[in-house]
């Protein structure tokens, strides 16, 4: 088994080929996690789970608009009976899937110091990353009666040993790479040069990377990676280009991205020929007061409006929802 570091840009020739007729699809991923203060230092305790009560409405909404969410579940969620009941019902009915999301600071074993660096699971010692992941993966399978096939490292925190760990655990898809983004200033990965198209992590084509979709828009979009590298040293450098509408980095998320911006990102991604557009957001945003993106009920309603508009645009472009299982099958799994 030869599996390189997922922190590195893949070598040429690793792009995944999808089966004829697959077309262009959309996958909705939900970072399904505890509520915590994003502005405060990381803590093992003191989190909440009250927003779980809002998940049934979201699931019903998804079924109405034709979305098929993948709930990427972390340790506090899988330990919560209400969350397991709500998500498990959708999984059993075939209207949702469940995957793994590792937040190491709230996931046993608790053998590391809680810090910003250690909030990226890939920065942990190899054995500790594996121990935390294995406990979580096994708990998810036991709780939902379904073997998870997809993984996202919390905070997109892959590491040099993550790829063989995922392969050994039978994970078929990773979706931790957030292309065009750089977290190295916090001690995390730099994905600014990683491709947007799905690619194989390993030459044996057992582990597929499905990057979270972002796109550069504007006259200077070809210079996007360079401009963002300069921003590391000049924090206000990029904002001027954005304000003048010369360059925008558009992530396909309702968190901090307007529907109009997202639809530009959708159009760019479709025109670029991406086989799968990967949308993402955090489950606590489904209720007010838990994330910076939904401080009020009105902002929660705006999130639903965002999904209505974006999925209508996708439908108009002929882009249908897909599942993790369909992606695995379409790439030869």
Descriptions of predicted regions:
Residues 6-92, 279, 313-318:
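Active-site beta->alpha N-cap acidic-glycine motif
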Residues 2-9, 13, 153-272:
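Active-site-adjacent pocket scaffolds in enzyme catalytic domains
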Residues 75-157, 205, 214-216, 283-284:
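Metal-dependent polysaccharide deacetylase catalytic core of the NodB/CE4 family, i.e.
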Residues 38-44, 110-122, 289-295:
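Surface-exposed, active-site-proximal loop segments in enzymatic domains
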Residues 55-59, 84-88, 130-137, 163, ...:
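Generic structural signal for well-ordered alpha-helices
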Residues 109-110, 185-190, 223, 287-294:
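Histidine/acidic-residue-rich catalytic or RNA/ligand-binding cores of hydrolases
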Residues 239-333:
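C-terminal domain-boundary segment and adjacent tail
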Residues 26-30, 69-71, 98-102, 149-151, ...:
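Hydrophobic faces of well-ordered beta-strands that scaffold small-molecule active sites
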């Amino acid at each position: 088994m030869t599996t390189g570091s997922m922190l590195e840009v893949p070598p040429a020739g690793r792009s995944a080929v999808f089966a004829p007729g697959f077309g262009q699809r959309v996958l909705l991923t939900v970072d399904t996690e505890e509520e915590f203060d994003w502005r405060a230092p990381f803590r093992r305790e003191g989190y909440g789970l009250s927003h779980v009560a809002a998940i049934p409405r979201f699931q019903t909404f998804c079924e109405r608009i034709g979305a098929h969410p993948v709930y990427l579940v972390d340790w506090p969620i899988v330990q919560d009976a209400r969350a397991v009941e709500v998500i498990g019902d959708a999984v059993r009915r075939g209207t949702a899937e469940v995957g793994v999301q590792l937040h190491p600071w709230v996931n046993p074993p608790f053998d590391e110091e809680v810090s910003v660096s250690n909030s990226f699971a890939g920065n942990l010692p190899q054995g500790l990353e594996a121990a935390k992941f294995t406990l979580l993966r096994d708990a998810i399978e036991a709780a939902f009666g379904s073997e998870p096939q997809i993984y996202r490292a919390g905070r997109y925190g892959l590491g040099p040993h993550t790829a063989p760990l995922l392969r050994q655990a039978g994970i078929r898809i990773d979706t931790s790479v957030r292309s065009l983004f750089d977290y190295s200033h916090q001690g995390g990965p730099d994905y600014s040069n990683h491709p947007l198209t799905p690619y194989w992590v390993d030459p044996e084509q057992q582990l597929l990377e499905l990057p979270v979709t972002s796109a550069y828009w504007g006259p200077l979009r070809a210079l996007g990676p360079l401009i963002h590298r300069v921003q590391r040293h000049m924090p206000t450098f990029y904002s001027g280009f954005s304000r003048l509408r010369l360059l925008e980095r558009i992530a396909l998320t309702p968190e901090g991205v307007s529907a109009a911006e997202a639809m530009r990102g959708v159009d760019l991604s479709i025109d670029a020929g991406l086989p799968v557009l990967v949308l993402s957001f955090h489950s606590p945003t489904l209720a007010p007061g838990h994330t910076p993106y939904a401080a009020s009920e009105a902002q929660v309603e705006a999130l639903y409006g965002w999904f209505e508009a974006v999925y209508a645009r996708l439908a108009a472009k002929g882009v249908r929802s897909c599942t993790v299982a369909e992606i695995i099958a379409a790439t030869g799994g």
